[in-house]
Regions:
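C-terminal scaffold of the Radical SAM
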Residues: 1-224
Length: 224
């Protein structure tokens, strides 16, 4: 629907769960004008994926990404470092990422939200605690060095990209440009209007003051 109305300069990204990356879905996304895919892998460790309740294995994610690459050149993944039970920064499976043809990779440290299920499990000692901050920072550095080795350069605190594959949405956020987010949990900005989509036809909108807008832009620019 949107495809014919988008310019060559438009970045149209869809975030996919590995189990949703079917051939039929990918064809429809391509036909609809989508030109970039981000797949939430989160971990390459099957035991941790199970604890996360993700519903797939590393091999499922690998096969899904190869399907994505059959339809999209501009495709990347998200990873999380510091999940409880994580024993090291890199495993032999990380070496396989070199063959995936990644255009982009986002690497986030785990944030243990106070009211989350995981935080409750840690408090009840059902789950081990996450690694301490120093360990997590060290592992992030190791992952960053690995990504550089496979051709992904760091261009922002948590983001790495192949040449000319930096995420335009990230740049739009930093520069205070307008962007639109669709789907549950998505955020958008048009001028001084901010909105968040909660799904089920529920959306929060807020118009911020010029001063708040300027402060927001300044803080986001620090991420580079």
């Amino acid at each position: 629907v949107l495809g014919p109305h988008l310019s060559d300069e438009t970045e149209f990204t869809v975030e996919l769960h590995p189990l949703d990356a079917t051939t039929d879905t990918l064809k429809r996304l391509k036909d609809g004008g989508v030109n970039r895919i981000s797949m939430g892998v989160q971990s390459l460790d099957d035991a941790i994926l199970s604890k996360m309740g993700r519903g797939y294995t590393f091999h499922d994610a690998e096969r899904a990404f190869y399907r994505i690459r059959e339809h999209f050149e501009n495709a990347g993944i998200d990873l999380i470092v510091g999940y409880p039970g994580e024993e090291c920064a890199l495993s032999p499976r990380h070496a396989r990422l070199a063959k995936w043809g990644l255009a982009h990779c986002s690497v986030y440290s785990l944030i243990l939200e106070e009211k989350s299920i995981l935080a409750n499990q840690v408090r009840r000692k059902v789950s081990p605690p996450p690694p301490d901050d120093d360990t997590t920072l060290n592992r992030l550095s190791i992952v960053a060095a690995f990504l550089k080795e496979i051709g992904l350069n760091r261009y922002e605190i948590a983001n790495y990209a192949a040449p000319q594959r930096e995420c335009r949405h990230n740049f739009a956020v930093w520069r205070g440009e307008d962007y639109v987010g669709l789907g549950e949990g998505a955020h958008g900005r048009i001028g001084r209007l901010r909105f968040q989509d909660f799904g089920m036809d529920s959306m929060k909108q807020e118009e911020v003051s010029p001063d708040a807008d300027m402060k927001e832009r300044t803080l986001f620019r620090l991420r580079t």
